[in-house]
């Protein structure tokens, strides 16, 4: 049998990110064959991940990463908020965000891409991390923005480490104007988006289903009134709804007397060039994930009964 040296264990750990004891076990089981040990670890990781796959993962981190005229945001979920403080988890999230910058930014492309510095994909690296940390984790979503000129500003709310927290926002400002002033404005708008959570840039981005649902709610409130009156109420109500949920029509959080579109128009004079907000991304951790209600006392009792 081949000698399992510390150097061999370190080499396997560097390639896979698996724990030292798992690496030693893998090498022992495969008689020191690195490639076979990698396969052994993958199978073990897949088995562990499969056991945890049904568990709700609504905690974790949202991260933003930027480079020049490109920026990306991702959300990686875990079961508990303790994992967000884990350096290995944070490192994975950071590297996955960098991968998003070098792909088309979709979560499928990120998952399939090679993990930086390793021979495995991002998805395979996450599987190994699940086996190491012991919680279910998911690469939930990813997005990428770009500008031909201008800036992509970012903001992270509830930051745990730099660029990673509970809410991540990107804002694309297309302009040939002063970059420093654009960056300041972009960050203010990013903070606005984090606070007010617009559904879309403007009315054209609101789905017909959402509009129909809002109209139905308005009509239900005014049942019994003449049809023409109901129609006017619904029309007025939808306009008010757009002002509440579309970014360009919202009252600017830093100056409620102006809409975001007015702020952008006025800023053109300050930056010295035409200015257009072309897109934004807002990821809030666990948004839309139904969390399980757990009875802690019952959970402890059940665990004690199994031991």
From Swiss-Prot:
Coarsely, its chief localization is cytoplasm
Q: Name one Pfam family in it.
A: EF_TS
Give the record's GO CC terms: cytoplasm
Q: Which GO terms describe its molecular function?
A: translation elongation factor activity
PROSITE patterns, per the entry: EF_TS_1, EF_TS_2
Reading the lineage from the top rank, the first entry is: Bacteria
Would the keyword Protein biosynthesis turn up in this protein's UniProt record? yes
Write out the coiled-coil annotation as residue ranges: none
Cell location? Cytoplasm
The alphabetical list of record keywords is: Cytoplasm, Elongation factor, Protein biosynthesis
Disulfide bridge map: none
UniProt keyword annotation of Oxidoreductase present? no
Q: Where is this region: Involved in Mg(2+) ion dislocation from EF-Tu?
A: 80-83
NCBIfam families named among the record's database cross-references: tsf
State what this protein does.
Answer: Associates with the EF-Tu.GDP complex and induces the exchange of GDP to GTP. It remains bound to the aminoacyl-tRNA.EF-Tu.GTP complex up to the GTP hydrolysis stage on the ribosome.
The UniProt entry's sequence similarity note says: Belongs to the EF-Ts family.
Q: What is this protein called?
A: Elongation factor Ts
Query: What organism is listed for this UniProt entry?
Result: Xanthobacter autotrophicus (strain ATCC BAA-1158 / Py2)
Q: What is the lineage of its organism?
A: Bacteria, Pseudomonadati, Pseudomonadota, Alphaproteobacteria, Hyphomicrobiales
What is the gene name? tsf
